[in-house]
Amino acid sequence: MNCEKESQMTIASQSIEDFKECLYQMQEARKSVTNEILETGHIKADQVQIFKSTLEEMNDERTSKNHIRDIHSRGTTFGINIQDEIKGLQKDHHFLDAFAVESDKENNSFANVLKLCDLPGLLSKFVDDEIRFEKEVAECKAFLMDLIDTSTTGGIKPLFITDWDGTMKDYCSQYATNLQPAYSAIVMGVFSRLFTRAFAVLTAGPLRHPGILDLTALPINGPVLFSGSWGREWWLGGRRIVHDDGIPEEGSVAIGQLCEQLDEILHEGEFVQFALVGSGVQRKVDRLTLGVQTVFKQVPEDLSARYIDAVRERIHRVDPNSQYLVLENCSPLEIEVCVHSSGAVWNKGDGVAALVESLHDSLKVGKVCVAGDTASDVPMLKKAADENPENVRALFVNINKQLQENITNIVGDAKRVCFISSPDVAHAAFAQIISEFSG
């Protein structure tokens, strides 16, 4: 791989195109390594070299000590925070380097290699409080052990339905490079294959362009199922299944036309950086989500305001009479352009129902675990609790006390609820269970 395509005159910054290409090529390597480990349990040391070289690239003189990388495009230079990208690479480099060494030894099983690599110990080095992390991992492990115990369900394995960002994947400042590390993909994939009858990711983002299928390191036709747009679109059996209930055809056409219009303004000098600002540009089944500011407030307010005005102007071009599209200010960080829909508002609970129907499964059977990190994930839990009140479980990340109380009340039993501080707690617990109970 060659990530060093910068000309001498732009060495102080990196182009958007080369920045994304460098990370996307590395993500393809992650997918390849993950797939090989899932299939064979082994990798070679030379397959890990790309992680070291990409990490060195991301830590060169164009990135400051506080992880701000200078990026340029069409005469505009700006900084983006790449702390998540760097941390993911650091963890992968250490983990995969150790995995390659141990898996090269004769007659070393996958479970034993994973144990020797000590993923929980590695991940604990990246937190502020190692003792708290280890305590949470032990509690999460006990919670998951109860979940996968089939002695009370007639041998039926559980369903595991989870949110993505903030739950199974740390938040990233740029959606376009919100890339899943290989260590996460490996333990998720093996845990889902061994201990669940279905492990499904239900995210608000889209499936493609970019979407969860581009950003994950897992094989998209592998042990973990993926959805986008709050479960309105699923990738099942190698094809995209869309649930467009209540969305008029004219609205879908208008969203498509607007997406083309926005692609034009994102190639104009003034607004190029918005492709990498927060949510970027996400085309979902019934809306577009647009990032207008970063969590670190790196975009000048007047530039953000001009961008929003430009979006409004393009909406007016596509839908001059405001028949099909509406602009909503979701937060200081993003706006959404939504299709006027008929009927009830779709939520993640509807996405769960769509999945179960497509799988010809039932929430009433066996145990069901719902994982999330915000109030938008609660409809998934409510749906599962309504269908299976005695066997529903909740695993939630880094949430406030009020939401914790709400979740505990929905489940109805504190023993069937687990609260953790980061996705890596779950990854570490997955690794421990795989090492100890998969032979």
Curated annotation (Swiss-Prot):
User: What's any GO biological process attached to this entry?
Assistant: trehalose biosynthetic process
Q: Which UniProt keywords apply?
A: Hydrolase, Magnesium, Metal-binding
Catalytic residues at 165 (proton donor/acceptor)
Any phenotype upon disruption? Lethal at early larval stage. Mutant larvae show intestinal defects, and a high proportion exhibit gut obstruction (gob). No visible phenotype when gob-1 is down-regulated together with the trehalose phosphate synthases tps-1 and tps-2.
- Found in which tissues? Ubiquitously expressed. Strong expression in intestine.
Catalytic activity annotated for this protein? alpha,alpha-trehalose 6-phosphate + H2O = alpha,alpha-trehalose + phosphate
Q: Which Pfam families match?
A: T6PP_C (PF21141), T6PP_N (PF18572)
Q: Which cofactor does it need?
A: Mg(2+)
User: Which residues does the record give as substrate binding sites?
Assistant: 282-284
User: What binding details are noted for the cofactor?
Assistant: Binds 1 Mg(2+) ion per subunit.
The keyword Magnesium belongs to this UniProt entry's keyword annotation:
yes
Would you indicate the residue range of the signal peptide?
none
Entry's Gene Ontology molecular function annotations: metal ion binding; trehalose-phosphatase activity
Annotated Mg(2+) binding lies at: 163, 165, 373
Any one GO CC term of this protein is: cytoplasm
Q: Which InterPro entries match?
A: HAD-like_sf, HAD_sf, T6PP_C, T6PP_helical
Q: Which family does it belong to?
A: Belongs to the gob-1 trehalose phosphatase family.
Tell me, what does this protein do in biology?
Answer: Catalyzes the hydrolysis of trehalose 6-phosphate to trehalose and phosphate; prevents the accumulation of toxic levels of trehalose 6-phosphate.
What name goes with this protein? Trehalose-phosphatase
Q: Which organism is it from?
A: Caenorhabditis elegans
Q: Which lineage do the record's taxonomy fields give for this organism?
A: Eukaryota, Metazoa, Ecdysozoa, Nematoda, Chromadorea
